[in-house]
Amino acid sequence: MGVEWLVEKLQEHDITLNDKQKQQFQTYYELLVEWNEKMNLTSITDEEGVYLKHFYDSITAAFYIDMNQELSICDVGAGAGFPSIPLKIVFPQLKVTIVDSLNKRIQFLNHLADALDLRGVSVVHERAENFGNVRGDNRESYDIVTARAVARLSVLSELCLPLVKTGGHFIAMKSSKGEEELEEARFGIGVFGGRVEAVETFELPGDAGERQMIIIEKRSKTPKKYPRKAGTPNKSPLLK
């Protein structure tokens, strides 16, 4: 299982990869394994696992939201670049901003963007609470904000929804417990200006596990007092 497997699986969803994109994915895999020996980027390093559980899994967001247009995307807590870098490779017109609080991951992502010759990728070393506060230019400025298995949805909603422009979407990419998390997060989602538009449940190929994608539309502006100061959303999520 490698890049040709990815090509085949994406074609089932009318997504075609050219030679440059195939090479970008292969280089991505090689750099991920190389840098992972120096720093802990991922516990999944075998080729099959990376292509399935990182690359393919990241691109599933495009099965439910049309990415064939010029969109601004902010990826909160992207770690080794998931889901935003695979999406950027497949849809090069996307304008991507990645926010991560750990400097070593920022170093990797900057190197990766250069090595893959990606244009329109900005990597920011910052906590999401600070990035989305009322004093910055980033608040309510993105068409799509993504987060993939970073924290519970009740926490992520406070970090991500302030960054989404009205009419845009927050996409939370979760495992099989996404709907469970959604129940406790519903109150906060409403407070932050969001409305649950869809919950998409699907299986990864090869019985590799269930995934749930929670798509939240931004209906109104987030009150200025959110997000609260760094660390507070995680310690005391807004549940009711």
Swiss-Prot record:
Keyword entries, A-Z: Cytoplasm, Methyltransferase, rRNA processing, S-adenosyl-L-methionine, Transferase
Cross-referenced CDD domains: AdoMet_MTases
Residues that bind S-adenosyl-L-methionine: 77, 82, 128-129, 148
UniProt keyword Cytoplasm, yes or no: yes
GO molecular function: rRNA (guanine-N7-)-methyltransferase activity
InterPro entries: rRNA_ssu_MeTfrase_G (IPR003682), SAM-dependent_MTases_sf (IPR029063)
Protein name per its UniProtKB record: Ribosomal RNA small subunit methyltransferase G
Organism: Staphylococcus carnosus (strain TM300)
Lineage: Bacteria, Bacillati, Bacillota, Bacilli, Bacillales
